[in-house]
Amino acid sequence: MSNDLTSESKTANRAAGEKFRDADKLAHIPIKVVSSTKATMLRKPSWLRIKLPKSSERIDNIKANLRKNDLHSVCEEASCPNLSECFNHGTATFMILGDICTRRCPFCDVGHGRPLAPKSDEPKKLANSLKDMGLKYVVITSVDRDDLRDGGAQQFADCVKEIGEQAPNTKVEILVPDFRGRMDRALEILNQNPPHVFNHNMETAPRLYTKVRPGANYQWSLDLLKRFGEANPDVTTKSGLMVGLGETNEEILEVMQDLRDHGVTMLTVGQYLQPSKDHLAVERYVHPDDFAMFEREAKKMGYEHAACGPLVRSSYHADKQAAGEEVK
């Protein structure tokens, strides 16, 4: 039995809603992750220092709103380094379909296990929350839901529709999983209620997929972006990459070109940061000059907008990205 099948059967035997993280989460992935120690961890450079906010009032308000509506933010679940800045700015990336993922990507801090059934009232609660916070731009993402026949596509579509009805002035970006084995069904559903921006992250170079994205397929992800873009030519397609996982600058440039060849016009490139000692180690810290080079090359390739910087994340200042403003 393959590692994938073995891990899936072990997950199936666990109680729904039980969440596993760090070493417990990564115990059965195809390529084992060796836990880091202080001696093996690279020291963070000065340009990765994060400014802490002077006040947490805005942060507390957004967290309270999320709790009140039984919602999750990927900012919290994935331990994003920009949480304080984004929450203080009054923006958040909402994570629908629960906080338990069916996959075990070793770069990601989201918990793994058997997810609970989707909540039918989640789209309405999400729209109400947006209206309460007065957000003009929102990013909706999700865990992978390989347990669902549509991969969770209907929940995305319902959220987009509900927000359009309750908060018509709010622009919506969806950051979707790859809908493994369910692309036709998922696209048929998503095309009925398209967002303003369609985002799916490639994450890394194809050479590293078995290590970084076990269960995913490089060409499949490219095809997902291309097919949605062809069906919805007025919708911007977007993707994001991480650096520091063992790739070369040349490989990142090749992925950037592949994305352009598949119709993607918006790009983010940021530094990978290790969530815990049990996750994939950072193999290099990319200098800001290299990020500036990625941005220059992206413009040459024809990207309409590219945000490249050490702390840039896929949904970091997504409102500014969509408006074509500079993001660092």
Swiss-Prot record:
A Pfam family per the record: LIAS_N
Sequence similarity: Belongs to the radical SAM superfamily. Lipoyl synthase family.
SUPFAM superfamilies assigned: Radical SAM enzymes
NCBIfam families per UniProt: lipA (TIGR00510), PRK05481.1 (NF004019), PRK12928.1 (NF009544)
This protein's name: Lipoyl synthase
Radical SAM core domain ranges (all copies): 87-304
Cofactor(s) for this UniProt protein: [4Fe-4S] cluster
Annotated pathway: Protein modification; protein lipoylation via endogenous pathway; protein N(6)-(lipoyl)lysine from octanoyl-[acyl-carrier-protein]: step 2/2
Binding site for [4Fe-4S] cluster 1: C75, C80, C86, S315
Enzyme class per UniProt: transferase
Organism field: Colwellia psychrerythraea (strain 34H / ATCC BAA-681)
Reaction(s) catalysed (UniProt annotation): [[Fe-S] cluster scaffold protein carrying a second [4Fe-4S](2+) cluster] + N(6)-octanoyl-L-lysyl-[protein] + 2 oxidized [2Fe-2S]-[ferredoxin] + 2 S-adenosyl-L-methionine + 4 H(+) = [[Fe-S] cluster scaffold protein] + N(6)-[(R)-dihydrolipoyl]-L-lysyl-[protein] + 4 Fe(3+) + 2 hydrogen sulfide + 2 5'-deoxyadenosine + 2 L-methionine + 2 reduced [2Fe-2S]-[ferredoxin]
CDD domains associated with the record: Radical_SAM
Keywords: 4Fe-4S, Cytoplasm, Iron, Iron-sulfur, Metal-binding, S-adenosyl-L-methionine, Transferase
Lineage of source species: Bacteria, Pseudomonadati, Pseudomonadota, Gammaproteobacteria, Alteromonadales
Any single Gene Ontology cellular-component annotation: cytoplasm
Co-factor binding comment: Binds 2 [4Fe-4S] clusters per subunit. One cluster is coordinated with 3 cysteines and an exchangeable S-adenosyl-L-methionine.
InterPro entries: Aldolase_TIM (IPR013785), Elp3/MiaA/NifB-like_rSAM (IPR006638), LIAS_N (IPR031691), Lipoyl_synth (IPR003698), rSAM (IPR007197)
EC assignment: 2.8.1.8
Keyword Signal on entry: no
PANTHER family: LIPOYL SYNTHASE, LIPOYL SYNTHASE, MITOCHONDRIAL
Positions bound to [4Fe-4S] cluster 2: C101, C105, C108
Compartments, as annotated in UniProt: Cytoplasm
Entry's Gene Ontology molecular function annotations: 4 iron, 4 sulfur cluster binding; lipoate synthase activity; metal ion binding
